[in-house]
Amino acid sequence: YTDEREIQHALDAGALVIVVPTIDTVEEAIAARNWTYFPPLGRRSNGGGQAFDAAMWGNVPGGYRNTINDNVVLILMIETLEGLQNAAAIAAVPGVTAIFAASGDLANFTGYRQGDPDYERMINVVHDAAINANIRLCGPLAWRDRPDFTCFQAGSETAAITRGVSLELGELANTQASPEVGPFALQP
């Protein structure tokens, strides 16, 4: 679970978007909100002050401290049956910008397979919670054509790096060959 220290460090380093996994209760949603926002909405401390560094934020009209509450994005992930049961109340917590229908983990934690009618009903619960709270609804990029989904997870950074490396080095790939020189060369 993401804690106050992790959120504080991310924000102090300049993060503008905080994504918190496995939010199951209103209390957890309020805690995440409190750690993300300065008073009066939250209880974020000034911490080490890294985010207030003039080199990083000196050109922000009004300064970082006075403007960040209006610019930070807080996304809470609904991944379990408990989170699903509390989705409407979680989405209604002031300061929550969006809820994320965590497609894979909802399937993992509930036992329903993506595409099954019961699975789709779960996604509709998250959908309705976001729409009724007038916040954004997030999901995987594959859902970009679903109604009302407006922010997306494009995939893992590992997969993106692997694709990039494959494109860059693809012509060099020859996994069947044996090295002829060097420490991995086959010895006669």
Where are these regions (language model features)?
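Conserved anion-binding
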Residues: 5, 13-94
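C-terminal active-site rim and adjoining tail of enzyme catalytic domains
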Residues: 131, 138-170
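Glycine-rich, proline-tolerant flexible connector loops at the mouths of alpha/beta enzymes
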Residues: 101-118
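C-terminal helical cap(s) of enzyme catalytic domains, especially alpha/beta-barrels
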Residues: 26-42, 112, 157-182
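Alpha-helix-loop-beta-strand connector modules within alpha/beta enzyme cores
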Residues: 1, 34-44, 66-70, 115-138
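Hydrophobic faces of well-ordered beta-strands that scaffold small-molecule active sites
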Residues: 18-20, 74-79, 99-101, 137-140, ...
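Conserved, mostly hydrophobic/aromatic
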Residues: 18, 32, 90, 102, ...
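Non-catalytic positions within long, well-ordered alpha-helices that form the structural scaffold/packing
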Residues: 11-12, 91-92, 144-148
